[in-house]
């Protein structure tokens, strides 16, 4: 059921007329064998291939045609350079070329094989032949070895051994080639068990490089999990162990069913088609579907739709196909393991109950037809897996039965009452995600259970923010939530580990995570649509109204805490009150912060840092305090100012400071300054201001990380260009600003605080402190900072995205402030450009919250005009226009 889907590109029937294939090189005269003529004819052949592909000729036909063309070219050159007269030599295709698979930019790997070492004159002729091929711009990899050298080097190197196993004679001494074949398929050359084990380890290491999933948004068609290499691995093992040279021969040996062979052939054909198209788009060899190539490839494959729809359709097909390859690869390698290694051949299975048994640590069916007769037994198997920690996976023949039953389901599993009870029992059990939901996803049982899941399987998110498809991201959210029950997670997520045991029903959090992105790709607000699905699902599964509404609220508001913490002024009591009013209870707050942290971490490994952690902690505790105080009771801001001052004073008295001088400094500061700084920060500022020459600006760089970044404090005469000067200089030093608090005292002195990070997201390196401090001093001292923001080109990735600039003025009751939400394409020097616009318009900035989400920036600025009042409608219009004119990407960037 869950594997039935349409590959958009494969449904096309195109039959336009194409030109005839150019003549093969075997017909070339000796006078034709020089570079310009050969290059002209090779180019004609390559143009014919592109034309044929565009006209609907299959990739299989064209790949074989290219291999055949190169065979004829090499045979002709072998004769031209006189090797047909050299005894006991052969030209052998190895690797992908040995399999007869050449894409437009594929490497052409050849072996010049000889009985005895070639003499100098013969070696020189080989060099001339290879040089000619290079001059034709063919990517040729070659080796020149005697038979003995081949065997010795093959024994020492798995890659060389694998290439030799795939070898194919192009021309030359047949007996010599067969002699090599006899040796490499003997028991002394990489015995089958040793070769199998080495290839499994090699595949595991390769998968690790891609985080164990093909669902990265820029996958490698060849090497990602579920890609062509996973099919090659099956063929290599079968070739070495059985001598099978094709998937059909694997059926003859009883290790593939006809259906599995057809599925692998279909998968290989699809992956070949995408790879062939990619090679036509590129000029240099690569197999990665990078963002800037995806649209061109999708269009070449005739995917249709508006905007990024062709890419989304193509990538959805790709991800679904690689899922099938991965499942078959794992199942068949397990079957090979039993056949080749036979480690557990004599071990009797241990009964688990009347339906299942344990083979080693793998669960196995006792009745091979059980899943077809009783589909709910599929859920009974996963319930056993979550309850029994001895079970580490599913036995290969049971996977085969599961795949068969899955395809013959007449309705979703959730329509069966017993299956629903089992599903909820799984969710309520510790380890539900890793031991049940994850394997259910890997084997498409989640899709078979709940139809909504099928719509997000392979659903990509065309941005730089999300690293995975929607289904893979959701599974990672679930795994992250499960990790909060583990004490080992405490150092990285102390708050969530502390709160998790206090969640009355953790299964409701898992349900919310399962549905939080379920409506992505449907159009409309995915949070609202997903909440509707969640309520229906919860009620269908017997949850009461309170439980159903909690799950729906978490789905509807799963972005609320992240948006509030990162894009709102959480030191504003009104923001905390508004957020608290939505949350309503401490219990809902605990659920929400757990879902929020898991969602951020599972979106992109590089997204979570101590800066985001500090913001969420601050919002959590401020909201908790507000909820305990009661929604009707606003915080006493005067009391908080007094409290901060007294605590800072107590710290300063330990240094025997001049209190009279301190009070002169503090008397010039406004209440906001004391509200928005901790007592430690107030004491740090005062300590240095008391010792500082008041005729010069002061720049302080904190030695301790603040909110995961480095705090920079600036005291200087205020002027409109000050912010632009500071952020411009920080940008020139490759520092990113994440937060800015801007204060102007009653005497016109600015007291500004910036939180900055290095490009890798870490606090400012200690050895850079004096350099940055000195650079900022110089920038501030210039009477009118005119250093233009750096103009740098957008990276190729960023250039591929379109984020129109939006200037949204948020509603507020504050008549003295304007809240500007700026959304724009992330680009070098953005904040410096924005600061210059503020300065040009004579605006004063009071705070800034900087948020980068993939290719987008979503920043919050609190502004006032020169009279310290909110911006007029006319000023807001001018500001919005200036921002759009300056920040919308163009060719100059």
From Swiss-Prot:
The keyword Amino-acid biosynthesis does not apply. GO terms for molecular function: [protein-PII] uridylyltransferase activity; phosphoric diester hydrolase activity. PROSITE patterns: ACT, HD. It catalyses: [protein-PII]-L-tyrosine + UTP = [protein-PII]-uridylyl-L-tyrosine + diphosphate; [protein-PII]-uridylyl-L-tyrosine + H2O = [protein-PII]-L-tyrosine + UMP + H(+). Uridylyltransferase (UTase) activity is inhibited by glutamine, while glutamine activates uridylyl-removing (UR) activity. Residues 711-793, 819-893 form the ACT domain. SMART domains: HDc (SM00471). Residues 470-592 form the HD domain. InterPro entries: ACT-like_dom_sf, ACT_dom, HD/PDEase_dom, HD_domain, NT_sf, PII_UdlTrfase/GS_AdlTrfase, Polymerase_NTP_transf_dom, UTase/UR. Its cofactor is Mg(2+). Residues 352-710 are annotated as: Uridylyl-removing. Its EC number is 2.7.7.59, 3.1.4.-. One of its GO terms (biological process) is regulation of nitrogen utilization. The keyword Nucleotidyltransferase applies. Pfam families: ACT (PF01842), GlnD_UR_UTase (PF08335), HD (PF01966), NTP_transf_2 (PF01909). PANTHER family: BIFUNCTIONAL URIDYLYLTRANSFERASE/URIDYLYL-REMOVING ENZYME (PTHR47320), BIFUNCTIONAL URIDYLYLTRANSFERASE_URIDYLYL-REMOVING ENZYME (PTHR47320:SF1). Belongs to the GlnD family. Modifies, by uridylylation and deuridylylation, the PII regulatory proteins (GlnB and homologs), in response to the nitrogen status of the cell that GlnD senses through the glutamine level. Under low glutamine levels, catalyzes the conversion of the PII proteins and UTP to PII-UMP and PPi, while under higher glutamine levels, GlnD hydrolyzes PII-UMP to PII and UMP (deuridylylation). Thus, controls uridylylation state and activity of the PII proteins, and plays an important role in the regulation of nitrogen assimilation and metabolism. This is Bifunctional uridylyltransferase/uridylyl-removing enzyme.
């Amino acid at each position: 059921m869950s594997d039935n889907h349409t590959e958009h590109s494969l449904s096309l029937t195109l039959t336009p007329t194409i030109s005839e294939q150019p003549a093969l090189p075997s017909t070339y005269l000796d006078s034709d064998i020089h570079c310009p003529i050969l290059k002209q004819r090779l180019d004609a052949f390559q143009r014919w291939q592109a034309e044929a592909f565009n006209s609907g000729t299959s990739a299989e036909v064209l790949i074989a045609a290219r291999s055949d063309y190169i065979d004829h070219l090499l045979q002709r050159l072998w004769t031209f350079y006189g090797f047909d007269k050299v005894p006991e030599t052969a030209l052998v295709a190895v690797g992908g070329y040995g399999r007869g698979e050449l894409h437009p930019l594929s490497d052409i790997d050849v072996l010049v094989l000889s009985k005895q070492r070639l003499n100098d004159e013969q070696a020189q002729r080989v060099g001339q032949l290879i040089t000619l091929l290079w001059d034709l711009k063919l990517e040729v990899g070659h080796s020149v070895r005697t038979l003995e050298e081949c065997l010795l080097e093959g024994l020492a190197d798995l890659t060389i051994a694998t290439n030799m196993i795939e070898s194919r004679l192009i021309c030359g001494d047949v007996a010599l080639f067969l002699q090599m074949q006899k040796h490499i398929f003997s028991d002394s050359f990489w015995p089958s068990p040793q070769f199998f084990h080495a290839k499994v380890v090699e595949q595991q290491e390769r998968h690790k490089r891609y985080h164990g999933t093909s669902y990265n948004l820029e996958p490698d068609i060849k090497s990602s999990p579920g890609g062509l290499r996973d099919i090659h691995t099956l063929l290599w093992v079968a070739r070495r162990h059985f001598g099978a040279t094709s998937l059909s021969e694997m059926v003859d040996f009883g290790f593939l069913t006809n259906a599995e062979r057809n599925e692998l052939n279909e998968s290989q054909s699809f992956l070949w088609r995408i790879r062939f198209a990619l090679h036509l788009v590129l000029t240099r060899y690569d197999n990665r579907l990078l963002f800037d190539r995806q649209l061109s490839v999708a269009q070449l494959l005739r995917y249709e739709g508006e905007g990024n729809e062709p890419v989304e359709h193509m990538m959805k097909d790709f991800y679904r196909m690689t899922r099938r390859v991965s499942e078959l690869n794992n199942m068949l390698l397990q079957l090979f393991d039993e056949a080749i290694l036979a480690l557990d051949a004599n071990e009797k299975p241990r009964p688990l109950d009347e339906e299942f048994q344990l083979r080693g640590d793998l669960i196995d069916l006792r009745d091979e037809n059980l899943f077809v007769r009783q589909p709910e037994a599929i859920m009974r198997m996963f319930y056993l897996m979550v309850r029994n920690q001895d079970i580490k996976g599913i036995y290969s023949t049971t996977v085969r039965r599961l795949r068969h039953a899955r395809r013959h389901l007449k309705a979703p599993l959730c329509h069966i009452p017993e299956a629903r009870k089992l599903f909820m029992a799984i969710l309520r059990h510790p380890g539900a995600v890793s031991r049940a939901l994850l394997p259910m996803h890997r084997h498409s049982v989640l899709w078979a259970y709940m139809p909504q899941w099928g719509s997000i399987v392979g659903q990509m998110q065309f941005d730089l923010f999300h690293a995975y498809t929607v289904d893979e991201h959701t599974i990672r959210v679930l795994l992250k939530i499960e990790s909060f029950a583990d004490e080992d997670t405490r150092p990285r997520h102390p708050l969530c580990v502390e709160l998790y045991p206090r969640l009355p029903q953790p299964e409701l959090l898992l349900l919310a995570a399962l549905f939080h992105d379920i409506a992505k790709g449907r159009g409309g607000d995915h949070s609202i649509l997903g909440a509707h699905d969640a309520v229906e699902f919860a009620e269908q599964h017997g949850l009461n109204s309170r439980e159903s509404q909690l799950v729906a609220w978490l789905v509807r508001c799963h972005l609320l805490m992240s948006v509030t913490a990162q894009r709102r002024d959480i030191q504003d009591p009104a923001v905390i009150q508004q957020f608290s009013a939505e949350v309503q209870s401490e219990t809902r707050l605990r659920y929400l912060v757990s879902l929020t942290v898991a969602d951020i971490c599972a979106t992109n490994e590089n997204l979570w840092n101590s800066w985001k952690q500090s913001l969420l902690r601050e919002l959590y505790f401020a909201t908790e305090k507000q909820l305990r105080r009661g929604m009707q009771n606003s915080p006493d801001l005067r009391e908080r100012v007094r409290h901060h001052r007294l605590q800072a004073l107590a710290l300063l008295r330990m240094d025997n400071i001049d209190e009279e001088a301190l009070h002169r400094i503090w008397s010039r500061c406004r209440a906001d300054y004391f509200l928005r700084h901790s007592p430690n920060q107030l004491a740090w500022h005062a300590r240095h201001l008391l010792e500082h020459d008041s005729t010069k600006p002061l720049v302080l760089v904190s030695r301790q990380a603040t909110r995961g970044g480095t705090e920079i404090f600036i005291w200087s005469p205020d002027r409109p260009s000050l912010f632009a000067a500071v952020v411009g200089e920080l940008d020139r030093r490759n520092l990113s600003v994440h937060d800015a608090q801007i204060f102007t005292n009653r005497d016109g002195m600015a007291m500004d605080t910036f939180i900055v990070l290095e490009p890798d997201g870490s606090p400012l390196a200690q050895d850079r402190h004096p350099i940055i401090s000195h650079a900022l001093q110089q920038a501030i001292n210039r009477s009118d900072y005119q250093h233009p923001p750096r103009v740098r080109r957008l990276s190729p990735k960023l250039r591929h995205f379109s984020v129109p600039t939006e200037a949204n003025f948020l509603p507020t009751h504050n008549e003295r402030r304007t809240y500007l939400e700026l959304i724009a394409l992330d680009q070098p020097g953005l904040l410096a450009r924005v600061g210059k616009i503020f300065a040009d318009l004579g605006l004063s900035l009071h705070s800034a919250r900087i948020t980068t989400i993939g290719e987008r920036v979503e920043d919050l600025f609190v502004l006032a005009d020169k009279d310290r009042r909110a911006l007029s409608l006319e000023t807001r219009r001018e500001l919005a226009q200036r921002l759009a004119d300056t920040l919308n990407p163009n060719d100059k960037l």
